[in-house]
């Protein structure tokens, strides 16, 4: 999530939380945000985010970690996870990976980033808010 605009800039759907899945998402985010500006990456302290592969993939970024057992440090993404479940996924009986992928894609790419307003973004969508800057 690009915190300033509350925009999901990269995501990966997997049935496990392996380091390779996390690295794939980081690589997507890097490709999306091709910039030389200093970047801060925030995560919690689970194994995937403290591994050597993670450190290598994010070596040019400033690392920021949540305190152990304190999800409020990562409240924006925790809120997003709650929203996608409550507003969208809980409405469906997901039958397989392909169906789940389509649902997540629809929510993020055709609603959350493009239509859903956020008070933080002056009641604009993340895409519209980001265009201002």
Indicate residue ranges for each PLM-predicted region.
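Charged DNA-binding/catalytic regions of mobile-element recombinases
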Residues: 1-133
